[in-house]
């Protein structure tokens, strides 16, 4: 590195202050946090790899910071020259360093948000740092409803205790950070929070600083790259770890805060322990849509594993409860039951397994006697599940275990009633109430597993059956004939098929899945979701297959409408379904419908998908009301804006009126799980946001759009869809350009999910899953699926009548939450974007004849951004959100570095003849440092590319995902 660069180089701290020159508020410590973490990291980097390599990292950081200041493309070339001169080992170290920096920046950001939140609460100020755009506090919401909107406290309480939010954790392959690193990140976050506590002593500070450095080094020394793809069982275990670490204790803690908030508006009751405020479901091990790795055996395994984990978590708490409930006074009901348990118990059977209360509990401790029996049965429940999981059988009789939640709750409720009857309500409302709330929330399996399968797979099974019965081909029948036959069979009792049914592997897989559902306890399962559902027969087919496979407690069947045409046809399909008497009797006045944000966005673009999802919900609710059915909408949202992501509070409050009505299901996917539940305070905040926003939407619904707004949206949606499809599906150059200009083809090397990136191995954009589609554009910071179509729609309506239509669009933005949220999220994406990165990728990776096409797309990007600001009435991006603007400025430099790293690495991978000017190894200050860089190359001995290239590429992908705070 040139001496003059060394001389003029400022510290990282100074660089950060140059990027974000002023504090946003008095309690703004983000730059301080960032600088501390980066300074500690650079010291570690120097110790491990030498001073020269540290200075190279600083030089690269400075070049990218200079680029961010003036956006001069020449700086990107200078950056590329430095990056391509590195040898294989150094290249991995530098890419890994910037990826690590972005993870540290995320942690600093989380600590700052948490700190500001605590400071606001101490002052009694509930205003959120994002102008209330991402927050929804339960106490603030209750006070607003009662004191501003004049709702009665009882009315609010009744609505709250009857509402349900079901959070569905999915294993979508967007969590690019390994669990090993997530745990280290949590410890770094914890150290950073404590370091800035007001009451910290000098000794504490020194020890915390040492711990911080230790964890930063441990994270940097951990291989970021998964060397093998996770299995569905791995994904399920990773998902379950959040329950163990935060959610399990987070739920009762949150419900206590709800009790306090209710008390503050004059309600002296607690939320009933069995009120279904928060529920949890999962797709991990149940989502077989396009994932051949999710087999019936996998589904069985994850159900048994969840049951074993649940029993173990209850078991670990029951002795604490036995210590707490040492009272001798009880009511007659409990006394009779305790005496009966005492007489019949044989403590010697399981006493050897216990550390505490291993002798028979005397009758003068009746609560302990009753809870002792609960402990015995929990132990047997856990062990039976463990045996079934490992051996397929168990010697423990099922009657010795808990088989239903009601059975589990019975002795606990008995203890609660007795304590209240004896004047000990304060004790009853302690740990026992928390335990009751956990049992009511988590049941015997922590989560209920949804099953998801493509509608065509059910059609194939029924086609095989009808052909075997020699009554024709189900596949070739009309919808009317299918319905007639299905209803005839559902009304009859004859079995449709026996062991002689010819079965392909695919047909056996579908039927065996139903057999697993029949075999396992019903409380293991939630919904059966049919993807690519288009007609009533899709739903009736699943009902018939459940009956034929002897499912005694049939799962509720949920059609999933994803593509634009399916969303448009969904209300009519639902009306036809509700017109079927058999089905209407079967559902008992309740229906769930899932709407997909990802595929609708890929099919038509974000603008048209958002509007069609809005209209479809309105129409579906109208249909349900007409037939007297309570409808629950299940929102299949991803983390990125292109897949329906965005702040929770706003996403809920911008839904159409009457579409939530106290009942909401929503997916929590991939990296969003960590963002929602990675820490106790994040978990608490997530539960608050969902609960408060759902309550507010029901009791203070958003306005309905004016007829002229609807007409404007309809007009713009047609234009936006045409623009989007004309480029993505009809432009002959697009597929080639997309695959050359982005790392889409290399996405699978990240090993971040168990399912393939495509539904079918060949084909174009339509066969590509939504996640890699969004991932590829997020990596290049061009975000095409999010904004494409907006510009054309705005331009056409403004060209028609600029003054009138601009006035109407601005009125829509200022008065209609849905429209404002839609535009604000696109504005946020523009704040993260940089078309010059796309131009660099084009120059390096795209054939020259496609360069004009890339220029055309970038012109559309700039025009769309300009029109969006005009409609929003903003002079510059994020002018109304200084906090987000500051956070993005601080992370842009390392992201840009990784963008350039990625472009040049892709060039070297795709063009082996590409020549680079290499310089001597940098990390040579000591033999040990040199050796450690070489060892990084050895982590991937089977790569088909030149040493170090594949790992460098994957590290850039992971780092950019961390920096953008989204993968796909």
Curated annotation (Swiss-Prot):
Question: How's its activity regulated?
Answer: By light-reversible phosphorylation.
* Domain of life of the organism encoding this protein: Eukaryota
An annotated GO BP: tricarboxylic acid cycle
PROSITE patterns attached here?
PEPCASE_1, PEPCASE_2
The answer to whether the entry has keyword Cytoplasm is yes
What's the EC number here?
A: 4.1.1.31
Where can this protein be found? Cytoplasm
Where Phosphoserine occurs, residue numbers? Answer: 11
Q: Which Pfam families match?
A: PEPcase
Q: Name one GO cellular component term.
A: chloroplast
Q: Could you tell me which Gene3D superfamilies the record lists for this protein? A: Phosphoenolpyruvate/pyruvate domain
Q: Where is the active site?
A: 172, 602
Report which reactions are catalysed by this protein.
oxaloacetate + phosphate = phosphoenolpyruvate + hydrogencarbonate
Q: Which family does it belong to?
A: Belongs to the PEPCase type 1 family.
Job of this protein: Through the carboxylation of phosphoenolpyruvate (PEP) it forms oxaloacetate, a four-carbon dicarboxylic acid source for the tricarboxylic acid cycle.
Subunit and partners: Homotetramer.
Q: What HAMAP family does the annotation carry?
A: PEPcase_type1
What NCBIfam families is this protein classified in?
PRK00009.1 (NF000584)
Q: What is the name listed in the Swiss-Prot or TrEMBL entry for this protein?
A: Phosphoenolpyruvate carboxylase
Organism, per UniProt? Answer: Phaseolus vulgaris (Kidney bean)
